[in-house]
């Protein structure tokens, strides 16, 4: 009985932690917020935690070219262009 209770409590903690790390607004809304540089505001970071903390290592131009060329399916490109390739 105690083991079951512990497992249920741990499952709830994991679920709550995952929910706090995810975007609370829609993907489109968070992309708009990010592209218009509203992520610096504390309340926006909380509403769009995943998107606001997702960055491209390469320039926006370079990642855009790579995405147009269909390179987003490659692991190294996904790591360098997380935001552009929707891999956050």
UniProtKB/Swiss-Prot annotation:
Pfam families: ShK. Residues 54-88 form the ShKT domain. Keywords: Disulfide bond, Ion channel impairing toxin, Nematocyst, Potassium channel impairing toxin, Secreted, Signal, Toxin, Voltage-gated potassium channel impairing toxin. Expressed both outside and in acontia, a specialised envenomation structure laden with batteries of venom-containing nematocysts found only in the superfamily Metridioidea. It is found in: Secreted; Nematocyst. Inhibits voltage-gated potassium channels (Kv1/KCNA). Belongs to the sea anemone type 1 potassium channel toxin family. This is KTx type I.
